Amino acid sequence: SSTCIPSGQPCPYNENCCSQSCTFKENENGNTVKRCD
């Protein structure tokens, strides 16, 4: 029903991503955020 989250966008869970994979990544500010792979 809901559209999947594209690669590189913030995500809560793996299932939300088009790739079915949401992992912690470091951004420019050095903060760690979960984004779709």
Swiss-Prot record:
One of its GO terms (cellular component) is extracellular region. GO terms for biological process: defense response. Disulfide bonds join 4-18, 11-22, 17-36. It comes from the Eukaryota. SUPFAM superfamilies: omega toxin-like. This is Omega-hexatoxin-Hv1c. Expressed by the venom gland. Keywords: Calcium channel impairing toxin, Disulfide bond, Ion channel impairing toxin, Knottin, Neurotoxin, Secreted, Toxin, Voltage-gated calcium channel impairing toxin. InterPro entries: Omega-atracotox, Omega-atracotox_CS. The presence of a 'disulfide through disulfide knot' structurally defines this protein as a knottin. Belongs to the neurotoxin 08 (Shiva) family. 01 (omega toxin) subfamily. It comes from Hadronyche versuta (Blue mountains funnel-web spider). Inhibits insect, but not mammalian, voltage-gated calcium channels (Cav). Its main location: secreted. It is found in: Secreted. The record marks 10, 27, 35 as: Critical for insecticidal activity. Pfam families: Omega-toxin (PF06357). Signal peptide: none annotated. One of its GO terms (molecular function) is calcium channel inhibitor activity.
